[in-house]
Each structure stands twice: as C-alpha cells, then as structure tokens.
Design a protein with these regions (language model features):
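Non-catalytic signal-transmission and effector/linker regions of two-component phosphorelay proteins
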Residues: 1-10, 117-133
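Alpha4 helix (beta4-alpha4-beta5 surface) of REC/receiver domains from two-component response regulators
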Residues: 67, 90-108, 121
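Conserved acidic carboxylate
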Residues: 13
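Active-site residues of response regulator receiver
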Residues: 57, 87
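Acidic catalytic/metal-coordinating carboxylates
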Residues: 38-41, 64-70
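Acidic, metal-coordinating helix/loop segments flanking the phosphotransfer/catalytic sites
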Residues: 35-53
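Two-component/phosphorelay signaling modules centered on CheY-like receiver
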Residues: 16-34
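A Lys-centered signature of the CheY-like receiver
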Residues: 112
C-alpha cells in the first residue's frame, strides 16, 4: 500500500463534488492531493508538485483527457508517472476507446460513478505494480 510519503496525487476533475470528496477522503489517509478543474489548472499543479499518480477525468471543459495525458507525459519527469482515467461516459466502455486512452499513456481506465474506496484500491494496485520486486 502506498505510504503518505510516496502517494502525493493530482486529481483533474471538473465535477466539484467528486473532486472534493476524493481530496477529503485521501487527506484522511494522510495523502496529499492537489485538485485541478481543467487542463490548464492541471499543468500548473504539475509544475508545482511531483505526484506519484494522477487521476484524470476524460471529459474536461477545456481539453480532452487523452490529449492532456499526452501533454503531461511530455513534461520533464512525468513520462513514467501513472495516469488513471475515470469517465462517466458509456462511450469509454468500448474497448477501442479504452485502448486509445491506454495509448495516450494511461495506466488504468475506470468508470464513474466509482466509490472513492474502490478508486483507492485501484491506485494501490497501480503503485504496487511500479515498485521493483
């Protein structure tokens, strides 16, 4: 399980309720989370912090999540940072769309609504897979 020392996160989510609930629950776990409502805020946050994982909505008001993910992966030091996509759109249940997200650089693709505890379990799995054996 990630410790609070290695689990700083950025969540890019335009749904205020989901974003704030996630931040509140993670802070109770001792995890530092920076929230961003759109792509511009995400890039600013990523220039100010070095998260171990990024949670990203696919449908953002100013940019498509896949495009933002590609942009993030080009930032210095972010090539290997895991990105977990979340989306409420049934469009992204199609394997071809999910594959496109993975090609954009995602480590995981999850449907919304999703319970924060379920999302935390997925984050733990991604973090475990990155640790050397």
């Amino acid at each position: 399980m990630p410790s609070s020392a290695d689990s700083a996160m950025v969540i890019v989510e335009d749904d205020d309720h989901f974003r704030e609930t996630f931040i509140d629950v993670m802070s109770l776990k001792g995890v530092e989370v920076t929230g961003a409502r759109n792509g511009d805020e995400a890039i600013k946050a990523l220039k100010q912090t070095r998260p171990s994982v990024i949670i990203m909505d696919v449908q953002l008001p100013d940019v498509h999540g896949f495009d933002l993910c590609k942009r993030v992966k080009r930032l210095e030091g972010y090539k290997d940072t895991p990105v977990i996509f979340v989306s409420a759109s049934s469009q992204y249940s199609d394997p071809r769309d999910r594959a496109e997200g993975m090609l954009a650089g995602a480590s995981q693709f999850l449907p919304k609504p999703i319970a924060v505890e379920k999302l935390w379990a997925e984050i733990e799995g991604v973090m475990r897979s990155l640790r050397p054996s």
